Amino acid sequence: MADTKQDMENSEDGRKLVKMSSLKQKAISASNRFKNSFKKKTRRTSSKIVSVANTDDINGDDYLSVEAFRQVLVLDDLLPPKHDDLHMMLRFLRARKFDKEKAKQMWSDMLQWRMDFGVDTIIEDFEFEEIDQVLKHYPQGYHGVDKEGRPVYIERLGQIDANKLLQATTMDRYEKYHVKEFEKMFKIKFPSCSAAAKKHIDQSTTIFDVQGVGLKNFNKSARELLQRLLKIDNDNYPETLNRMFIINAGPGFRLLWAPIKKFLDPKTTSKIHVLGNKYQPKLLEAIDASELPYFFGGLCTCADKGGCLRSDKGPWNDPELLKIARNPEARFSTISEEDYLLVEEGTSMSMVFEPLERNKMKTIEENVSEKHIDAVDKFMALSLPPKPHLKTLRKGKEPQKKDDSFLVGGVIAFVMGIVAMLRLSKAVPRKLTDVALLTNSVYYEEAKMSKPNQDEVSAPPVSSSEYVIMVKRMAELEEKYKSLDSKSADEALEKDDKLQAALNRVQVLEHELSETKKALDETMVNQQGILAYIEKKNKKKRMFFRF
Protein backbone atom coordinates (compact mmCIF):
# COMPACT_ATOMS: atom_id res chain seq x y z
CA MET A 1 0.00 0.00 0.00
CA ALA A 2 2.82 2.33 0.92
CA ASP A 3 4.56 1.45 -2.32
CA THR A 4 1.38 2.26 -4.28
CA LYS A 5 1.05 5.58 -2.49
CA GLN A 6 4.71 6.34 -3.14
CA ASP A 7 4.25 5.50 -6.83
CA MET A 8 1.23 7.79 -7.04
CA GLU A 9 3.19 10.63 -5.43
CA ASN A 10 6.07 10.04 -7.83
CA SER A 11 3.65 10.00 -10.74
CA GLU A 12 2.02 13.20 -9.52
CA ASP A 13 5.43 14.84 -9.12
CA GLY A 14 6.35 13.70 -12.61
CA ARG A 15 3.22 15.25 -14.09
CA LYS A 16 3.98 18.48 -12.26
CA LEU A 17 7.52 18.47 -13.60
CA VAL A 18 6.22 17.85 -17.12
CA LYS A 19 3.74 20.71 -16.78
CA MET A 20 6.40 23.01 -15.37
CA SER A 21 8.75 22.04 -18.16
CA SER A 22 6.05 22.67 -20.76
CA LEU A 23 5.20 26.02 -19.20
CA LYS A 24 8.87 26.89 -19.06
CA GLN A 25 9.37 26.03 -22.73
CA LYS A 26 6.33 28.10 -23.75
CA ALA A 27 7.58 31.06 -21.72
CA ILE A 28 11.04 30.79 -23.23
CA SER A 29 9.57 30.51 -26.73
CA ALA A 30 7.40 33.59 -26.18
CA SER A 31 10.35 35.44 -24.70
CA ASN A 32 12.49 34.60 -27.70
CA ARG A 33 9.81 35.78 -30.12
CA PHE A 34 9.55 39.07 -28.26
CA LYS A 35 13.29 39.56 -27.89
CA ASN A 36 13.83 38.92 -31.59
CA SER A 37 12.62 42.49 -32.13
CA PHE A 38 15.69 43.79 -30.30
CA LYS A 39 18.49 41.29 -30.53
CA LYS A 40 20.53 39.48 -33.10
CA LYS A 41 20.79 35.74 -32.69
CA THR A 42 24.31 34.48 -32.16
CA ARG A 43 25.96 31.10 -32.29
CA ARG A 44 27.72 29.83 -29.23
CA THR A 45 31.25 29.24 -30.33
CA SER A 46 34.54 29.21 -28.54
CA SER A 47 35.37 32.77 -29.61
CA LYS A 48 31.90 34.16 -28.76
CA ILE A 49 31.98 36.78 -31.50
CA VAL A 50 29.04 39.14 -31.30
CA SER A 51 28.53 42.58 -32.77
CA VAL A 52 29.20 45.40 -30.35
CA ALA A 53 28.50 49.03 -31.17
CA ASN A 54 31.75 50.96 -30.98
CA THR A 55 30.34 54.16 -29.50
CA ASP A 56 32.85 54.63 -26.68
CA ASP A 57 34.30 57.69 -28.44
CA ILE A 58 30.88 59.41 -28.59
CA ASN A 59 30.09 61.38 -25.44
CA GLY A 60 26.72 61.25 -23.75
CA ASP A 61 25.26 64.47 -25.17
CA ASP A 62 26.35 63.64 -28.71
CA TYR A 63 25.00 60.11 -28.36
CA LEU A 64 21.56 61.38 -27.33
CA SER A 65 21.56 63.86 -30.22
CA VAL A 66 22.56 61.16 -32.70
CA GLU A 67 19.87 58.78 -31.41
CA ALA A 68 17.23 61.50 -31.73
CA PHE A 69 18.48 62.34 -35.24
CA ARG A 70 18.35 58.65 -36.14
CA GLN A 71 14.69 58.43 -35.12
CA VAL A 72 13.92 61.46 -37.30
CA LEU A 73 15.55 59.74 -40.28
CA VAL A 74 13.69 56.48 -39.55
CA LEU A 75 10.32 58.23 -39.46
CA ASP A 76 11.02 59.95 -42.79
CA ASP A 77 12.31 56.75 -44.45
CA LEU A 78 15.74 58.35 -44.95
CA LEU A 79 17.87 55.65 -43.33
CA PRO A 80 18.98 52.84 -45.66
CA PRO A 81 20.57 49.95 -43.73
CA LYS A 82 24.00 50.55 -45.29
CA HIS A 83 24.03 54.11 -43.90
CA ASP A 84 22.70 53.19 -40.45
CA ASP A 85 25.92 54.29 -38.76
CA LEU A 86 26.00 56.52 -35.67
CA HIS A 87 29.39 58.02 -36.53
CA MET A 88 28.21 58.97 -40.01
CA MET A 89 25.10 60.64 -38.58
CA LEU A 90 27.26 62.47 -36.03
CA ARG A 91 29.41 63.93 -38.82
CA PHE A 92 26.32 65.35 -40.53
CA LEU A 93 25.03 66.76 -37.24
CA ARG A 94 28.35 68.45 -36.54
CA ALA A 95 28.43 69.88 -40.05
CA ARG A 96 25.12 71.63 -39.33
CA LYS A 97 25.93 72.54 -35.70
CA PHE A 98 23.47 69.93 -34.39
CA ASP A 99 20.49 71.52 -36.13
CA LYS A 100 18.44 68.39 -36.86
CA GLU A 101 16.31 69.94 -39.60
CA LYS A 102 19.31 71.27 -41.52
CA ALA A 103 21.18 68.01 -40.96
CA LYS A 104 18.17 66.04 -42.22
CA GLN A 105 18.02 68.17 -45.38
CA MET A 106 21.75 67.68 -45.89
CA TRP A 107 21.33 63.92 -45.36
CA SER A 108 18.42 63.77 -47.81
CA ASP A 109 20.40 65.69 -50.44
CA MET A 110 23.33 63.32 -49.90
CA LEU A 111 21.14 60.25 -50.51
CA GLN A 112 19.71 61.80 -53.68
CA TRP A 113 23.20 62.73 -54.91
CA ARG A 114 24.47 59.21 -54.30
CA MET A 115 21.59 57.78 -56.31
CA ASP A 116 22.02 60.27 -59.18
CA PHE A 117 25.81 59.94 -59.26
CA GLY A 118 25.83 56.14 -58.93
CA VAL A 119 28.11 56.25 -55.90
CA ASP A 120 27.14 52.88 -54.44
CA THR A 121 28.66 50.99 -57.37
CA ILE A 122 31.31 53.47 -58.51
CA ILE A 123 34.21 51.38 -57.15
CA GLU A 124 33.21 48.42 -59.31
CA ASP A 125 31.84 50.30 -62.32
CA PHE A 126 34.34 53.13 -62.87
CA GLU A 127 37.85 52.50 -64.21
CA PHE A 128 40.27 55.44 -64.31
CA GLU A 129 42.71 54.25 -66.98
CA GLU A 130 44.52 57.58 -67.21
CA ILE A 131 45.61 57.48 -63.56
CA ASP A 132 49.35 57.38 -64.40
CA GLN A 133 49.17 60.49 -66.57
CA VAL A 134 46.99 62.28 -64.01
CA LEU A 135 49.41 61.57 -61.15
CA LYS A 136 52.26 62.77 -63.34
CA HIS A 137 50.64 66.18 -63.76
CA TYR A 138 48.94 66.21 -60.34
CA PRO A 139 51.21 64.51 -57.72
CA GLN A 140 49.02 63.24 -54.88
CA GLY A 141 48.36 60.18 -52.76
CA TYR A 142 48.03 58.63 -49.32
CA HIS A 143 51.16 57.85 -47.36
CA GLY A 144 51.15 56.36 -43.88
CA VAL A 145 49.27 57.50 -40.79
CA ASP A 146 49.74 60.21 -38.19
CA LYS A 147 50.50 59.54 -34.53
CA GLU A 148 46.80 59.04 -33.78
CA GLY A 149 46.32 56.49 -36.56
CA ARG A 150 44.62 58.70 -39.15
CA PRO A 151 45.61 58.33 -42.83
CA VAL A 152 47.84 61.08 -44.23
CA TYR A 153 46.95 62.54 -47.63
CA ILE A 154 49.57 64.54 -49.58
CA GLU A 155 49.31 66.87 -52.58
CA ARG A 156 52.23 68.74 -54.16
CA LEU A 157 50.31 71.65 -55.61
CA GLY A 158 53.38 73.42 -56.91
CA GLN A 159 53.96 70.59 -59.38
CA ILE A 160 50.44 70.68 -60.86
CA ASP A 161 50.20 71.39 -64.57
CA ALA A 162 46.52 72.25 -65.02
CA ASN A 163 46.64 72.40 -68.82
CA LYS A 164 48.24 68.96 -69.20
CA LEU A 165 45.99 67.54 -66.48
CA LEU A 166 42.84 68.50 -68.37
CA GLN A 167 44.39 67.16 -71.57
CA ALA A 168 44.92 63.78 -69.90
CA THR A 169 41.37 63.59 -68.52
CA THR A 170 38.11 65.54 -68.28
CA MET A 171 36.50 67.31 -65.35
CA ASP A 172 33.68 64.78 -65.18
CA ARG A 173 36.01 61.79 -65.16
CA TYR A 174 38.30 63.33 -62.56
CA GLU A 175 35.24 64.11 -60.44
CA LYS A 176 34.26 60.42 -60.56
CA TYR A 177 37.82 59.43 -59.67
CA HIS A 178 37.68 61.80 -56.70
CA VAL A 179 34.41 60.25 -55.46
CA LYS A 180 35.77 56.73 -56.00
CA GLU A 181 38.79 57.52 -53.82
CA PHE A 182 36.51 58.87 -51.10
CA GLU A 183 34.42 55.69 -51.18
CA LYS A 184 37.57 53.55 -50.97
CA MET A 185 38.69 55.64 -48.01
CA PHE A 186 35.45 54.96 -46.12
CA LYS A 187 35.20 51.28 -47.09
CA ILE A 188 38.88 50.27 -46.87
CA LYS A 189 41.24 52.87 -45.44
CA PHE A 190 39.24 54.10 -42.45
CA PRO A 191 38.19 50.58 -41.31
CA SER A 192 41.80 49.36 -41.66
CA CYS A 193 43.13 52.32 -39.67
CA SER A 194 40.43 51.77 -37.05
CA ALA A 195 41.44 48.13 -36.69
CA ALA A 196 45.12 49.06 -36.42
CA ALA A 197 44.56 51.88 -33.91
CA LYS A 198 41.85 49.96 -32.00
CA LYS A 199 39.54 52.97 -32.10
CA HIS A 200 37.10 54.48 -34.55
CA ILE A 201 38.71 56.66 -37.23
CA ASP A 202 36.81 58.59 -39.89
CA GLN A 203 39.04 61.63 -40.44
CA SER A 204 42.36 62.21 -42.18
CA THR A 205 45.37 64.52 -41.97
CA THR A 206 46.26 66.43 -45.14
CA ILE A 207 49.54 68.03 -46.28
CA PHE A 208 49.51 70.54 -49.14
CA ASP A 209 52.96 71.49 -50.45
CA VAL A 210 52.53 74.82 -52.24
CA GLN A 211 56.19 75.39 -53.08
CA GLY A 212 56.38 76.86 -56.58
CA VAL A 213 52.66 77.56 -56.85
CA GLY A 214 52.05 80.20 -59.50
CA LEU A 215 49.61 81.32 -62.13
CA LYS A 216 50.28 78.31 -64.32
CA ASN A 217 48.98 75.94 -61.63
CA PHE A 218 45.46 77.38 -61.32
CA ASN A 219 43.87 78.69 -64.46
CA LYS A 220 40.12 79.22 -64.82
CA SER A 221 39.41 75.55 -65.59
CA ALA A 222 41.46 74.40 -62.61
CA ARG A 223 39.55 76.75 -60.31
CA GLU A 224 36.25 75.43 -61.63
CA LEU A 225 37.37 71.84 -61.00
CA LEU A 226 38.51 72.75 -57.49
CA GLN A 227 35.16 74.36 -56.75
CA ARG A 228 33.26 71.26 -57.90
CA LEU A 229 35.41 68.94 -55.79
CA LEU A 230 35.06 71.11 -52.69
CA LYS A 231 31.28 71.15 -53.09
CA ILE A 232 31.21 67.35 -53.25
CA ASP A 233 33.39 67.10 -50.14
CA ASN A 234 31.45 69.63 -48.07
CA ASP A 235 27.97 68.41 -49.06
CA ASN A 236 28.42 64.63 -49.00
CA TYR A 237 31.52 63.81 -46.94
CA PRO A 238 31.42 66.38 -44.12
CA GLU A 239 33.75 66.47 -41.14
CA THR A 240 36.37 64.14 -42.67
CA LEU A 241 39.26 66.60 -42.28
CA ASN A 242 40.99 66.49 -38.91
CA ARG A 243 43.72 68.99 -39.79
CA MET A 244 45.57 70.35 -42.79
CA PHE A 245 49.14 71.60 -43.10
CA ILE A 246 49.92 74.03 -45.93
CA ILE A 247 53.71 74.14 -46.15
CA ASN A 248 56.17 76.26 -48.15
CA ALA A 249 53.60 79.04 -48.40
CA GLY A 250 55.25 81.82 -50.42
CA PRO A 251 54.11 84.98 -52.22
CA GLY A 252 52.59 83.01 -55.10
CA PHE A 253 50.38 81.04 -52.76
CA ARG A 254 49.29 84.15 -50.86
CA LEU A 255 48.11 85.63 -54.16
CA LEU A 256 45.87 82.62 -54.80
CA TRP A 257 44.84 81.84 -51.21
CA ALA A 258 42.20 84.61 -50.99
CA PRO A 259 40.00 83.40 -53.90
CA ILE A 260 40.41 79.76 -52.85
CA LYS A 261 39.53 80.47 -49.22
CA LYS A 262 36.10 81.84 -50.11
CA PHE A 263 35.07 78.39 -51.38
CA LEU A 264 35.83 76.78 -48.00
CA ASP A 265 33.55 76.43 -44.99
CA PRO A 266 34.64 78.65 -42.04
CA LYS A 267 34.86 75.62 -39.78
CA THR A 268 37.14 73.98 -42.32
CA THR A 269 39.45 76.97 -42.50
CA SER A 270 39.92 76.80 -38.70
CA LYS A 271 41.57 73.40 -39.15
CA ILE A 272 44.11 74.70 -41.67
CA HIS A 273 47.65 75.54 -40.51
CA VAL A 274 49.63 77.68 -42.97
CA LEU A 275 53.39 77.16 -42.51
CA GLY A 276 56.45 78.58 -44.21
CA ASN A 277 59.58 76.70 -45.20
CA LYS A 278 60.41 75.77 -41.58
CA TYR A 279 57.59 73.28 -41.29
CA GLN A 280 59.44 70.08 -40.29
CA PRO A 281 59.11 70.45 -36.47
CA LYS A 282 55.36 71.05 -36.78
CA LEU A 283 54.87 68.05 -39.05
CA LEU A 284 56.95 65.79 -36.80
CA GLU A 285 54.75 66.74 -33.86
CA ALA A 286 51.79 65.17 -35.66
CA ILE A 287 53.45 62.48 -37.83
CA ASP A 288 56.22 60.06 -36.93
CA ALA A 289 59.41 60.40 -38.99
CA SER A 290 59.07 56.81 -40.25
CA GLU A 291 55.66 57.71 -41.73
CA LEU A 292 56.77 61.01 -43.27
CA PRO A 293 58.30 61.13 -46.80
CA TYR A 294 61.94 62.10 -47.09
CA PHE A 295 61.14 65.24 -49.12
CA PHE A 296 59.25 66.57 -46.07
CA GLY A 297 62.08 65.80 -43.64
CA GLY A 298 61.02 62.24 -42.81
CA LEU A 299 62.80 58.90 -43.09
CA CYS A 300 60.60 57.07 -45.59
CA THR A 301 61.65 56.76 -49.24
CA CYS A 302 59.50 53.88 -50.57
CA ALA A 303 62.24 53.32 -53.16
CA ASP A 304 60.99 49.82 -53.94
CA LYS A 305 57.45 51.06 -54.66
CA GLY A 306 58.07 53.87 -57.11
CA GLY A 307 58.27 56.68 -54.56
CA CYS A 308 56.23 57.73 -51.56
CA LEU A 309 53.27 59.18 -53.46
CA ARG A 310 52.94 56.05 -55.62
CA SER A 311 53.34 53.55 -52.77
CA ASP A 312 49.94 54.03 -51.08
CA LYS A 313 51.62 53.07 -47.82
CA GLY A 314 49.33 52.40 -44.87
CA PRO A 315 47.58 49.81 -42.67
CA TRP A 316 45.16 49.07 -45.52
CA ASN A 317 47.95 47.09 -47.22
CA ASP A 318 48.07 44.61 -44.33
CA PRO A 319 46.20 41.47 -45.52
CA GLU A 320 44.74 40.77 -42.07
CA LEU A 321 43.52 44.33 -41.56
CA LEU A 322 42.27 44.45 -45.14
CA LYS A 323 40.28 41.29 -44.49
CA ILE A 324 38.66 42.93 -41.48
CA ALA A 325 37.93 46.07 -43.49
CA ARG A 326 36.27 44.16 -46.33
CA ASN A 327 34.31 41.78 -44.11
CA PRO A 328 31.77 43.60 -41.92
CA GLU A 329 31.18 40.45 -39.87
CA ALA A 330 34.86 40.37 -38.95
CA ARG A 331 34.70 43.87 -37.47
CA PHE A 332 33.15 42.46 -34.30
CA SER A 333 34.50 42.62 -30.80
CA THR A 334 35.30 39.41 -28.93
CA ILE A 335 33.67 38.97 -25.54
CA SER A 336 34.68 36.69 -22.72
CA GLU A 337 32.94 33.55 -21.51
CA GLU A 338 31.77 35.51 -18.46
CA ASP A 339 30.07 38.12 -20.65
CA TYR A 340 28.45 35.43 -22.76
CA LEU A 341 27.07 33.71 -19.66
CA LEU A 342 25.73 37.07 -18.51
CA VAL A 343 23.69 37.20 -21.69
CA GLU A 344 22.62 33.56 -21.45
CA GLU A 345 21.44 33.93 -17.85
CA GLY A 346 18.48 36.17 -18.56
CA THR A 347 19.97 39.53 -19.60
CA SER A 348 18.34 40.90 -22.73
CA MET A 349 20.66 41.07 -25.72
CA SER A 350 19.33 44.53 -26.50
CA MET A 351 20.75 45.74 -23.15
CA VAL A 352 24.26 44.46 -23.81
CA PHE A 353 24.98 44.15 -27.50
CA GLU A 354 24.21 46.35 -30.43
CA PRO A 355 25.22 45.75 -34.09
CA LEU A 356 27.66 48.08 -35.80
CA GLU A 357 25.12 48.63 -38.54
CA ARG A 358 21.71 48.45 -36.91
CA ASN A 359 19.03 46.49 -38.63
CA LYS A 360 15.41 47.50 -38.39
CA MET A 361 13.57 45.56 -35.71
CA LYS A 362 11.94 42.33 -36.83
CA THR A 363 8.42 41.12 -36.18
CA ILE A 364 6.94 40.83 -32.69
CA GLU A 365 4.31 38.26 -33.62
CA GLU A 366 4.48 36.18 -36.78
CA ASN A 367 0.79 36.57 -37.56
CA VAL A 368 0.98 40.40 -37.87
CA SER A 369 0.92 41.59 -41.47
CA GLU A 370 4.16 42.89 -43.01
CA LYS A 371 2.84 46.33 -43.90
CA HIS A 372 2.02 47.06 -40.24
CA ILE A 373 5.23 45.63 -38.89
CA ASP A 374 7.43 48.49 -40.10
CA ALA A 375 5.16 51.03 -38.43
CA VAL A 376 5.25 49.06 -35.16
CA ASP A 377 9.03 48.90 -35.38
CA LYS A 378 9.35 52.65 -35.86
CA PHE A 379 6.95 53.42 -33.02
CA MET A 380 8.73 51.04 -30.64
CA ALA A 381 12.12 52.46 -31.64
CA LEU A 382 10.93 55.82 -30.32
CA SER A 383 9.67 54.40 -27.03
CA LEU A 384 12.70 52.25 -26.17
CA PRO A 385 15.03 53.59 -23.45
CA PRO A 386 18.74 54.10 -24.17
CA LYS A 387 20.74 50.92 -24.04
CA PRO A 388 23.19 50.71 -21.11
CA HIS A 389 26.79 49.85 -21.83
CA LEU A 390 28.25 46.44 -21.05
CA LYS A 391 30.57 47.97 -18.43
CA THR A 392 27.58 49.46 -16.61
CA LEU A 393 25.87 46.07 -16.45
CA ARG A 394 28.97 44.44 -15.05
CA LYS A 395 28.86 46.77 -12.05
CA GLY A 396 25.30 45.69 -11.18
CA LYS A 397 24.11 42.71 -9.22
CA GLU A 398 25.06 39.20 -10.17
CA PRO A 399 22.46 37.44 -12.33
CA GLN A 400 20.16 34.84 -10.86
CA LYS A 401 20.68 31.17 -11.33
CA LYS A 402 20.16 29.91 -14.82
CA ASP A 403 16.91 27.98 -14.30
CA ASP A 404 15.17 30.69 -12.26
CA SER A 405 16.25 33.55 -14.51
CA PHE A 406 15.07 31.81 -17.67
CA LEU A 407 11.65 31.08 -16.19
CA VAL A 408 11.15 34.52 -14.63
CA GLY A 409 12.62 36.37 -17.61
CA GLY A 410 10.56 34.32 -20.03
CA VAL A 411 7.29 34.88 -18.20
CA ILE A 412 7.93 38.62 -17.81
CA ALA A 413 8.86 38.97 -21.48
CA PHE A 414 5.78 36.96 -22.50
CA VAL A 415 3.44 39.14 -20.42
CA MET A 416 5.10 42.35 -21.59
CA GLY A 417 4.82 41.16 -25.17
CA ILE A 418 1.08 40.58 -24.85
CA VAL A 419 0.56 43.97 -23.14
CA ALA A 420 2.62 45.74 -25.78
CA MET A 421 0.67 44.08 -28.59
CA LEU A 422 -2.67 45.02 -27.00
CA ARG A 423 -1.59 48.63 -26.57
CA LEU A 424 0.05 48.99 -29.96
CA SER A 425 -2.77 47.32 -31.87
CA LYS A 426 -5.00 50.28 -31.00
CA ALA A 427 -2.47 52.90 -32.01
CA VAL A 428 -0.71 51.40 -35.04
CA PRO A 429 -1.32 53.61 -38.11
CA ARG A 430 -2.64 52.07 -41.27
CA LYS A 431 0.07 53.64 -43.41
CA LEU A 432 3.73 54.38 -42.83
CA THR A 433 3.11 58.04 -43.55
CA ASP A 434 0.80 58.25 -40.54
CA VAL A 435 3.59 57.48 -38.07
CA ALA A 436 4.62 61.11 -37.74
CA LEU A 437 1.00 62.11 -37.05
CA LEU A 438 0.76 59.38 -34.45
CA THR A 439 3.87 60.52 -32.59
CA ASN A 440 2.77 64.15 -32.76
CA SER A 441 -0.62 63.29 -31.26
CA VAL A 442 1.03 61.33 -28.46
CA TYR A 443 3.31 64.27 -27.69
CA TYR A 444 0.31 66.62 -27.66
CA GLU A 445 -1.60 64.41 -25.23
CA GLU A 446 1.39 64.19 -22.90
CA ALA A 447 1.87 67.96 -22.97
CA LYS A 448 -1.82 68.42 -22.29
CA MET A 449 -1.73 66.04 -19.31
CA SER A 450 1.38 67.74 -17.89
CA LYS A 451 -0.52 71.07 -17.76
CA PRO A 452 -4.12 70.13 -16.78
CA ASN A 453 -4.85 73.35 -14.91
CA GLN A 454 -3.97 75.78 -17.67
CA ASP A 455 -6.79 77.18 -19.77
CA GLU A 456 -6.52 76.73 -23.48
CA VAL A 457 -5.94 80.02 -25.26
CA SER A 458 -7.05 80.10 -28.87
CA ALA A 459 -5.14 82.15 -31.42
CA PRO A 460 -6.76 85.50 -32.32
CA PRO A 461 -8.42 85.60 -35.75
CA VAL A 462 -6.69 87.34 -38.65
CA SER A 463 -8.70 90.03 -40.40
CA SER A 464 -8.79 90.45 -44.16
CA SER A 465 -6.93 93.77 -43.99
CA GLU A 466 -4.13 92.22 -41.93
CA TYR A 467 -3.96 89.35 -44.39
CA VAL A 468 -3.63 91.77 -47.34
CA ILE A 469 -0.87 93.69 -45.51
CA MET A 470 0.95 90.44 -44.78
CA VAL A 471 0.75 89.36 -48.42
CA LYS A 472 2.12 92.74 -49.56
CA ARG A 473 5.00 92.50 -47.12
CA MET A 474 5.79 88.99 -48.29
CA ALA A 475 5.80 90.21 -51.89
CA GLU A 476 8.15 93.06 -50.95
CA LEU A 477 10.46 90.66 -49.15
CA GLU A 478 10.49 88.34 -52.17
CA GLU A 479 11.40 91.25 -54.45
CA LYS A 480 14.19 92.33 -52.10
CA TYR A 481 15.49 88.79 -51.93
CA LYS A 482 15.49 88.43 -55.72
CA SER A 483 17.25 91.78 -56.05
CA LEU A 484 19.92 90.83 -53.51
CA ASP A 485 20.33 87.41 -55.09
CA SER A 486 20.84 88.88 -58.56
CA LYS A 487 23.27 91.45 -57.14
CA SER A 488 25.29 88.76 -55.39
CA ALA A 489 25.48 86.76 -58.63
CA ASP A 490 26.52 89.85 -60.58
CA GLU A 491 29.08 90.74 -57.93
CA ALA A 492 30.51 87.24 -58.06
CA LEU A 493 30.86 87.45 -61.83
CA GLU A 494 32.37 90.92 -61.53
CA LYS A 495 34.86 89.70 -58.93
CA ASP A 496 35.78 86.78 -61.15
CA ASP A 497 36.30 89.11 -64.11
CA LYS A 498 38.42 91.45 -61.98
CA LEU A 499 40.47 88.53 -60.73
CA GLN A 500 40.99 87.25 -64.26
CA ALA A 501 41.96 90.75 -65.41
CA ALA A 502 44.41 91.03 -62.51
CA LEU A 503 45.92 87.66 -63.38
CA ASN A 504 46.23 88.69 -67.03
CA ARG A 505 47.86 91.95 -65.96
CA VAL A 506 50.33 90.04 -63.80
CA GLN A 507 51.17 87.81 -66.76
CA VAL A 508 51.78 90.88 -68.92
CA LEU A 509 53.97 92.43 -66.24
CA GLU A 510 55.93 89.19 -65.88
CA HIS A 511 56.47 89.13 -69.66
CA GLU A 512 57.57 92.78 -69.70
CA LEU A 513 59.86 92.15 -66.73
CA SER A 514 61.40 89.22 -68.55
CA GLU A 515 61.98 91.34 -71.68
CA THR A 516 63.47 94.14 -69.58
CA LYS A 517 65.79 91.73 -67.82
CA LYS A 518 66.89 90.34 -71.18
CA ALA A 519 67.63 93.84 -72.52
CA LEU A 520 69.50 94.68 -69.32
CA ASP A 521 71.66 91.59 -69.68
CA GLU A 522 72.48 92.53 -73.28
CA THR A 523 73.34 96.09 -72.19
CA MET A 524 75.64 94.78 -69.47
CA VAL A 525 77.43 92.56 -71.99
CA ASN A 526 77.91 95.52 -74.35
CA GLN A 527 79.12 97.67 -71.47
CA GLN A 528 81.68 95.08 -70.48
CA GLY A 529 82.87 94.94 -74.10
CA ILE A 530 83.23 98.74 -74.23
CA LEU A 531 85.12 98.79 -70.93
CA ALA A 532 87.48 96.10 -72.21
CA TYR A 533 88.06 98.10 -75.43
CA ILE A 534 88.79 101.30 -73.46
CA GLU A 535 91.17 99.44 -71.16
CA LYS A 536 92.96 98.05 -74.20
CA LYS A 537 93.33 101.52 -75.74
CA ASN A 538 94.64 102.99 -72.47
CA LYS A 539 97.16 100.20 -72.20
CA LYS A 540 98.48 100.86 -75.72
CA LYS A 541 98.65 104.59 -75.00
CA ARG A 542 100.71 104.05 -71.84
CA MET A 543 103.13 101.80 -73.74
CA PHE A 544 103.51 104.46 -76.48
CA PHE A 545 104.42 107.23 -74.02
CA ARG A 546 106.86 104.93 -72.24
CA PHE A 547 108.91 104.57 -75.42
Swiss-Prot record:
GO BP: protein transport
Domain of life according to the entry: Eukaryota
Keywords (A to Z) from UniProt: Cell membrane, Coiled coil, Golgi apparatus, Membrane, Protein transport, Transport
Coiled-coil region: 464-526
InterPro entries: CRAL-TRIO_dom, CRAL-TRIO_dom_sf, CRAL/TRIO_N_dom, CRAL/TRIO_N_dom_sf, PI/PC_transfer
SMART domains from the UniProt entry: CRAL_TRIO_N (SM01100), SEC14 (SM00516)
GO cellular component, one term: Golgi membrane
Subcellular location, record wording: Golgi apparatus membrane; Cell membrane
SUPFAM superfamilies given in the database record: CRAL/TRIO domain, CRAL/TRIO N-terminal domain
Entry annotated with the keyword Iron-sulfur: no
Domain CRAL-TRIO: residue ranges: 130-304
Topology versus the membrane: Peripheral membrane protein
Chief place where the protein resides: Golgi
Sequence similarity: Belongs to the SFH family.
Purpose: Required for transport of secretory proteins from the Golgi complex. Catalyzes the transfer of phosphatidylinositol and phosphatidylcholine between membranes in vitro.
Name the UniProt record assigns to this protein: Phosphatidylinositol/phosphatidylcholine transfer protein SFH7
Organism this protein belongs to: Arabidopsis thaliana
